[in-house]
């Protein structure tokens, strides 16, 4: 989604840059053993298309200086807005600091908080080193919220100066899915950029010892959004019990179809050619089932309606949601409008 966002920003000529982390291994690759059982493999990624900016700087993580290096994805490489990626996998760092950018979704809580600091504080500091003066800092989820504490210190502890520059996108429709960490751990990890725990609790108006990243983002930002009309409604209801949060709008997520979608299928759609759409879909479906058969040995009938879960299969993504209301689901399947095949 983030990559698609940057492609669209490039096409629209929007004045925007992206900042992320450069993963050495990323999320694990699922491979199959000879007996078809799954194997988890951590393969080192290759980034020959990135440019070394020569920018190196230090941030504080766990009360310790950590070196950060910035790499750059040129807009012309993939026709995307400028993207900077940060890594700590450097010989100047100790091994623990190097591993901060090794694995996405690291199970170690301290490593995860360190990643949040790198993204937020490291990203905001990079913007300063580039001599940019952005009108807006956009947080995609609350993973980079530590940037708000960096900006708070930068603007002489004037929260309104942070708020007028900060916007926030929330994706998670369940409060339990929003990140919370022990506030004492966050403080020990240097997440709060020198603020005391009492100062943090007062600043984001919460006395809990569990630091709620999303709640802090909603109180620090001038504006937030959910990722669809319904999700916006769910988010407003979910956070309504909290006072002094910013307005939550609805902005529907979308993908840059020019990159990922089948071009011929869209040509038929634009031409209103229902026969062409149906024929092309059947061809693509058959090709997909051939890949599944090759990898798993399972055969699927292209003439049977098939639901495909094209996402990481994690419980909080709620794969069973589609059939939660079985009567409504059956009604959708029985509609004779040619949309389901």
What kind of feature is each model-predicted range?
Residues 1-341:
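Catalytic cores of carbohydrate-active enzymes across secretory and cytosolic contexts
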